[in-house]
Regions:
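Short acidic/glycine-rich loop or secondary-structure boundary segments that cap or lie
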Residues: 1, 14, 25-26, 58-61
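Short conserved beta-strand segments at catalytic cores or DNA/RNA-binding microdomains
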Residues: 1-15, 20, 31
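Short, surface-exposed connector motifs at secondary-structure boundaries
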Residues: 11-15, 41-48, 101-102
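Active-site beta-loop-alpha junctions of metal-dependent nucleic acid enzymes
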Residues: 16-41
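Acidic/histidine-rich, metal-coordinating catalytic segments
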Residues: 31, 41-60, 82-83
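Charged alpha-helix within mobile-element recombinases
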Residues: 55, 72-77, 81-146
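Short, well-ordered secondary-structure micro-motifs
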Residues: 60-63, 90
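Short, surface-exposed basic-aromatic patches at helix termini and helix-loop junctions that form
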Residues: 62-75
Length: 146
C-alpha cells in the first residue's frame, strides 16, 4: 500500500489517502472517490492543475484529468521534470511532514485509515509561517466561505 498526497496550491491544504498499490488504476480510482466526496465543482476549483512526478502510477493523464461525475475535465495534469523535486515543492514539504509520523520505507499497510486521517488533520492544522501562523485548514475554510 502507498499514500496518495494532494496539495492545494494556495492554502497548502493536504488530502492524504492510503491506496492499495502504486498503480494507475488505484490513483485514478482514489481521485474519483475524492472528487465524488468533494463534488465535481469544488474539486475542479480546488485542483485546477495537478503536478505529478514521472512515476508509472501517474502516467494515465487522461484518467487523472477526466471527471468521474460530469462530462468535462476535472483538472489539468502537468509532469515535473525528472530529478526536479523543487517543481513540486509544496507537495515535497507535505511529504516531509508525513515522514514525522511515517518514516520513508515504512509499510503503509500497518497504518490504519484513522491514523492516516489523524496525520492529515495534524498537517492541516499546523501553524504555517508562510501564513503568519494560520493553518491550512483555517485558510481553506475562509476560501470557501468567501
Amino acid at each position: 500500500q502507498v499514500l496518495l498526497v494532494l496539495t492545494e496550491r494556495k492554502t497548502r491544504y493536504e488530502i492524504v489517502s492510503k491506496i492499495k498499490s502504486k498503480s494507475q488504476y488505484c490513483v485514478v480510482k482514489e481521485l474519483d472517490k475524492i472528487e465524488r466526496k468533494m463534488g465535481a465543482k469544488k474539486f475542479r476549483e480546488t485542483f485546477k492543475t495537478i503536478t505529478c512526478d514521472n512515476g508509472c502510477e501517474n502516467l494515465d493523464f487522461e484518467g487523472i484529468e477526466r471527471s468521474a461525475v460530469v462530462k468535462r475535465k476535472r483538472t489539468k495534469v502537468f509532469y515535473a521534470h525528472p530529478y526536479s523535486a523543487w517543481e513540486r515543492g509544496s507537495n515535497e514539504n507535505a511529504n516531509k511532514l508525513i515522514r514525522r509520523f511515517i518514516p520513508k520505507g515504512s509499510d503503509i499497510g500497518k497504518f490504519s485509515h484513522e491514523r492516516i486521517k489523524m496525520i492529515e488533520h495534524w498537517i492541516n492544522n499546523y501553524p504555517r509561517r508562510l501564513f503568519n501562523g494560520l493553518s491550512s485548514d483555517l485558510l481553506i475554510k475562509r476560501m470557501y466561505v468567501a
